[in-house]
């Protein structure tokens, strides 16, 4: 949301509480977060929200302007959104502490390898699709926002990665929106 430049009010709903689902259902018909309410429009799921914001704020640079670059970024964001289940199960998000030493099975290592391959491809072939910068498409974009939870997991669990992946993670972890997200955790 913040990347779009739109003003908004954030409603924080504590999770894992007896009334969490009831509270979430007030804003999201799927009972999942995040959700965006813009007047009479309700959008849930990260990808739906990003697409809505990209259409509403076309100059925000959420996606590349070139169709081929935009299609690649959307495909990778969708892969990130719906994939890497073994990694998500093995490496839970926890921005409050470090949890090194988790043993990685072949499925998790396969996810890590695929993510690094995506990041290498972005840095090699798509690095200036959204301007110049250290992020996947140059400037920080929706694609980096989609990978922020993975960056958080890799950071929390001190996953050994390639040099280019570490440099990318350092850039994401230093981005003001990521710093703000971590501080709010």
Regions found by a protein language model. Name each.
Residues 2-103:
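GST-like domain detector, emphasizing the conserved glutathione-binding G-site
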Residues 184-185:
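Exported/periplasmic ABC-transporter solute-binding proteins
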Residues 1, 54, 119, 123:
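Conserved hydrophobic residues forming the short capping helix/wall of the S-adenosyl-L-methionine
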Residues 82-174:
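GST-like fold's C-terminal all-alpha helical module
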Residues 1, 73, 144-145, 175:
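Short, thiol/selenol-centered motifs that function as redox-active sites or metal-ligating centers
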């Amino acid at each position: 949301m913040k990347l779009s430049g739109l003003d908004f009010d954030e409603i924080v709903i504590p999770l894992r509480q007896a009334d969490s689902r009831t509270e979430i259902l007030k804003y999201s018909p799927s009972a999942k977060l995040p959700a965006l309410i813009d007047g009479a429009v309700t959008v849930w799921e990260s990808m739906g929200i990003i697409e809505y914001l990209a259409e509403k704020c076309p100059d925000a640079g959420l996606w590349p302007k070139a169709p081929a670059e935009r299609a690649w970024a959307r495909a990778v964001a969708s892969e990130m959104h719906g994939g890497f289940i073994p990694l998500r199960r093995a490496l839970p998000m926890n921005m409050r502490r470090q949890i090194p030493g988790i043993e990685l099975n072949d499925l998790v290592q396969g996810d890590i390898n695929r993510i690094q391959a995506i990041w290498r491809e972005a840095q090699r072939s798509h690095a200036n699709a959204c301007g110049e910068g250290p992020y996947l498409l140059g400037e920080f974009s929706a694609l980096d926002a989609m990978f922020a939870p993975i960056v958080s997991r890799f950071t929390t669990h001190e996953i050994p990665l390639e040099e280019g992946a570490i440099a990318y993670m350092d850039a994401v972890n230093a981005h003001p929106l990521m710093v703000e997200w971590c501080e709010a955790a």
